[in-house]
A protein has these predicted regions:
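Metal-dependent phosphohydrolase cores
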Residues: 1-145
Length: 145
């Protein structure tokens, strides 16, 4: 487990990379491209401080909601699901991460985008049931207040 202050280290990056690979394998959704998951981070860290690397990474990688193009929702969900294995402050699974994001998101369009793109992936990977998918819809889309 790593604290927030330790996340800029190579040791953390490698532990996260391993946890991501393990999670993708356990969910039976591993792809060869996942070998390159977050691969640029240790190299960028040689030139930039961690905050700049983090911002660049989130804006340029399709497994982050900050990415402006088409999201890679499976990689995103796997990333969320594995964070509890390496982040002391982020002990949520992928479903709970989505709930937290939807609860905090003030923009109705973004909540809808999150729901429409992520809920089917959670269900497909057996990370939530139809009851969980419906609960997301009723609590954060249909009746957000």
């Amino acid at each position: 487990m790593f604290t927030k202050s330790e996340r800029s280290s190579f040791k953390y990056w490698f532990a996260h990379w391993c946890a991501f690979q393990m999670t993708a394998l356990n969910l039976k959704h591993w792809k060869p491209k996942y070998l390159l998951h977050d691969i640029e981070k240790p190299f960028l860290k040689l030139f930039w401080d961690y905050k700049k690397v983090q911002k660049w990474h989130r804006n340029h990688n399709s497994h982050h909601t900050e990415y402006k193009g088409q999201w890679d929702t499976y990689e995103m969900v796997i990333d969320w699901e594995c964070s509890r294995f390496t982040k002391a402050e982020a002990q949520l699974n992928a479903y709970d991460t989505l709930v937290k994001m939807m609860r905090k998101e003030p923009d109705e369009k973004m909540r809808k985008k999150l729901y429409e793109n992520i809920a089917p992936v959670l269900y497909d990977l057996n990370l939530c049931s139809l009851v969980g998918v419906n609960a997301l819809y009723y609590n954060y889309i249909k009746n957000p207040n």
